[in-house]
């Protein structure tokens, strides 16, 4: 059998590629080695599917590390607004949430998955599930896809959309890198990204902070000389292995690259629990809160600022009793506490492995 386009991989990219090819008149085959299409899409965004982002192209590209500029040509053909129109034309209403993120109004990724699957059927895309590609033989005009039992499928165009090596339970095992290399692409070193950070700090190993969430904080990776590498602002979660949550996940690739670049075993990340406030302003606010309720303990009057367990942890770090009242509160201790809130440091030694990451860094070179 000969096709105009064969798409290998039934994830988000594969579904979009197959739909687009068929919509433009190509006889299209979609091959998926698993028993279900859209498996990774169904779990994206916490099962809600973060479809796209409404921020301007330049702002989106500025947030992409490395050579983000390569997306300008792609965005000139199909950008975030085109994605929104694509889904809304198919009846999927979207809504905007924080940081420009777009989700289906249904709050269910299955809405997006089922819509794409229906579109595959309407566009006449042929589907082969439970079918593993064993090899690809590239020709000048026609390429051969080798399937189990030495079955051969011929195509004028092959789209490799099999994903990286992250979230292997969805079928992403890195099959495509060898095929891309054979086609002439340069493959760069793989690394985990969008992945929790790990730490051997005593308070991490002893699970003192496990389960504590910090909302809307800034986390910065520091060079060995103390200068900042990158800052991300969002939520954090302390775990039994280190730090997770959106801000830590976004920072992870910078930590991975810096550990390798500086050839060190550990880096410091610094957490600012009050990023909109200068340190002196925070000191003044802490004093004001204590002064307004002079007979209450600082544990009570400062409680709105931080989760209680984290508040008590910081007080213990600076050797300040949680029961101290304003009358016995030393200014130097307020200064120390404010400094901890603005510059809480955690030594990190890496990340969880690539199979625990949401995204694979590296791969096909874009240069």
Predicted regions and their residues:
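An anion/pyrophosphate-binding glycine-rich loop and adjacent beta-alpha core
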Residues: 35-37, 42-43, 51, 57-58, ...
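Short hydrophobic core segments
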Residues: 6-8, 133, 153-168, 180-181, ...
